[in-house]
Amino acid sequence: MALEFTLNHVAPAAAVDCLVVGAYADHTLTPAAQALDAASGGRLTSLAQRGDLSGKTGATTLLHDLPGVSAPRVLVVGLGDAARFGVPQYLKAVGDAVRALKAGATRSALFTLSEVAIKDRDAAWAIRQAVIAADHAAYRYTATLGKKKTDDAGLAQLAIAGDDALALAQGQAIAAGVEFARELGNLPPNYCTPAYLAEVGVKFAGEHDGAEAEILDEHQMEALGMGSLLAVARGSANRPRLVVLKWTGGGDAKPYVLVGKGITFDTGGVNLKTQGGIEEMKYDMCGGANVIGTFVAAVKAKLPLNLVVVVPAVENAIDGNAYRPSDVITSMSGKTIEVGNTDAEGRLILCDALTYAQRFEPAALVDVATLTGACMVALGHQTAGLMSKHDDLANELLAAGEHVFDRAWRLPLWDEYQPMLDSTFADVYNIGGRWAGAITAGCFLSRFTEGQRWAHLDIAGVASDEGKRGMATGRPVGLLSQWLLDQAARA
């Protein structure tokens, strides 16, 4: 169940089930905690001195019926070392608080940590990110669970200390986009097919003024010459779709265009994946899910810009008609591609989608894809990989990610890597060999974005958590939404 958010800043007298305040490792209290301490005759200070209240990072202490405090509960969240308290510590504190309260009987709470000073961040940022982080922590997947396992208990309403209504609304919009993306990513592949992704896009656009959807089927894609995308789709009974979503909030200005890889399940094709990886391949559409989530955020925030989202939705499966290693296919651009590996399919659907996207004459073109395991090996789960030949665009995206702690790290896209994609039988080979796999994948895409202000985000390491119980993260909806907020502010 999604949280309801409001603004409030009368801490000691707030009419809520619980007040959320903070304490540092040295027992220093946040301003709201100091007010409660004074109202209760020094109760918080006494508990801290006795060791019954911890300010260590990750610690939460739930107190009941403090004298002089109207709320029946006070949750004290440990903030760690005061000198090191910054963006990641703040976001962790939000999550710690929400998880602690979701497990109990508290239905409403006031979160006061948004009033704590954070270096290089303002009050609007604190409110906006508190909403996003709280909603992320409260998320529970229930779509395919039995009725008895649905989650409607615990915290339902969270007031954020502050008075910036715009920041609250933006936070709610971005949180909705993140949740939308996570829900799509978490759905099993027999639910989330290419046709389902198309239906979801049409439904959302139909419910919001200024948004529209266009869906291309395989016959329309064939007429456009999308031979690369259609080659990947040949082996599946779930036929492909090209999902195109448009938001018109910026008059006649050129749109920002996001392209997201939408492989709804990736068997690897003839180059079949093995156990130990294939069971997580429902997440191979998270690039598509996350650009749709960013679209949701932009529409709900009513951003004053134009946005186009393009998602090639395809299942990479195997039957007698599946494409093979050594096939030569013709892309929409006219370039021919020799298939070296059918498990390097993401770039084959993206190249046609990127070519199609250029008809919108984008102000900037950004693709998002769970493209390579090589990027995950290089960067782990902490950051996405970013590639671009346009320093200004790369710097905008890097700054947006750093601002909201949804970070990316730039990798080179030098011409010296391009010969690794040479083919004897076609214009380009779809793999680059053993080395620099993330970079050569970016180089492949660069051949289909010439003349465009373009960047590539490889999100293989950040799109989902590891393991059997891992879930879609919604990254980088935060980065992309902040980037669009920045563009709207400059307009």
Curated annotation (Swiss-Prot):
Positions of the catalytic residues: K273, R347
Entry binding sites for Mn(2+) 2: K261, D266, D284, E345
One annotated Gene Ontology cellular component of this protein: cytoplasm
Chief location category: cytoplasm
Family: Belongs to the peptidase M17 family.
HAMAP family listed in its UniProt record: Cytosol_peptidase_M17 (MF_00181)
Record's protein name: Probable cytosol aminopeptidase
Organism of provenance: Stenotrophomonas maltophilia (strain K279a)
Gene name of the record: pepA
